[in-house]
Amino acid sequence: MSGFDRRSFLKASMVTAAATALAACASSERATGTTPKAAGKSVMGLVVPKMDEVRVGLIGVGERGIGFVHHFSRIEGARITAICDTDTLVLARAEKAINEYGRDKPAYFSKGDHAYRDLLNRDDVDIVVIATPWAWHHPMAKEAMLAGKHAFVEVPMAGTIEELWDLVDTAELTQRNCMMMENVCYGRDELMVLNMVRQGLFGELLHGEAAYIHELRWQMKEIDRKTGSWRTAYHAKYNGNLYPTHGLGPVAQYMNINRGDRLDYLTSVSSPSLGRAAYAKREFPADHQRNQLKYIGGDMNTSLIKTVKGRSIMVQHDTTTPRPYSRHNLIQGTNGVFAGFPNRIALENGGSGSYHEWDENMDSWYAKYDHPLWTRMGKEAEENGGHGGMDFLMCWRMIYCLRNGEALDQDVYDGAAWSAVFPLSVASVGDRGNSKDFPDFTRGVWQTAKPLGIVG
């Protein structure tokens, strides 16, 4: 066990045994919708000891993960110490990038699907960043925490309610962070709207609209590698909202979800599934594997969420039809509304005109309401890139919090609640749109948790 001392091994073995026992007794409770017994104390607002240097292990450096190689190589106080990917081509690309930055050589792992466990067994890794196909998110994040690491996992955090509970329980048992890296929460517009909401610009919040509308049929041509090689199959297996968090995450933060309010229940319906089959017929030979799949996922899925405080959120998913990109990013309050794509605002009091017409000139709004974090880091974020800078800013903020002993902006409860839309929408669609309840992953702590602050 290179780099993994006996004491650490024994401690990890004890935690793993406890986790196994907990899972055995909690499984039936999760399956029936009953809130399982807590595995440990809540990790709401978890603060861990300050780290002078954050040692980063990366699992998955393909289409998404290569960006993390660049970001963490540029952030002061972060050092990539280990990288794992089963694809030696993308691993070589990551190694080339590390060398170009003049950084110390990390350890590399690539032999087999479980080579990541060699990375987890190292004592020079503090956090594990997981950017792999969705099916690996849950097991890798869980094993990372059981190995004593903080887990940072790409979206969605997991694919079933039981898996989501398992990550919550493991985080509480190990007292480790498990953050789903919802990068859109760090976009300039989303941060500005959060600042507007916190300053009461829209009055009492009533309704939000979120979406992931992004035409991705072209990914079906990625057969042996890249995202489409594994993501296409989901459209033939599930009918619901496969990818809810990019739009929902920011709206949930506006509404203080898990910090004063909670997602209560959901109802979901889907349109017919036509676009994927038509695209396959047009673009591939009749005997091609893409024409052998039966695509059941509706081209457009629409889910309606009710919160415990009575507010409503519409969440849509469409990666099939030909239309412009949108996440909606709409928030409606008693004093007015903001909507994205394109950005526009209408207010009864405090606006520049009639609330019956949109104000689409955002310059004055940016000048007054740009989030302090963007004011401080926006230029550097844009220069370093990643979806307009949001990716870099997210990574910078993660490292900043760990180095300064601050709680992360997103926790395991956020990742669980936002990701739960996927399995709950599938269940609702399959049940004629009947409502499905969200678990209270916080076990009641949402009622006393402090809202996410405005940090600079």
Swiss-Prot record:
Keywords tagged on the record: Glycosidase, Hydrolase, NAD, Signal
MF (Gene Ontology): hydrolase activity, acting on glycosyl bonds; nucleotide binding
Post-translational modification as stated in the protein's UniProt record: Predicted to be exported by the Tat system. The position of the signal peptide cleavage has not been experimentally proven.
Ribonucleoprotein keyword on record: no
Gene3D superfamilies: Dihydrodipicolinate Reductase, domain 2, NAD(P)-binding Rossmann-like Domain
Cofactor(s) it depends on: NAD(+)
SUPFAM superfamilies from the UniProt entry: NAD(P)-binding Rossmann-fold domains (SSF51735)
Binding site for substrate: Y212, R231, Y243, P244, T245, H246, Y325
Function as written in the Swiss-Prot or TrEMBL entry: Glycosidase.
Protein name per UniProt: Glycosyl hydrolase family 109 protein 2
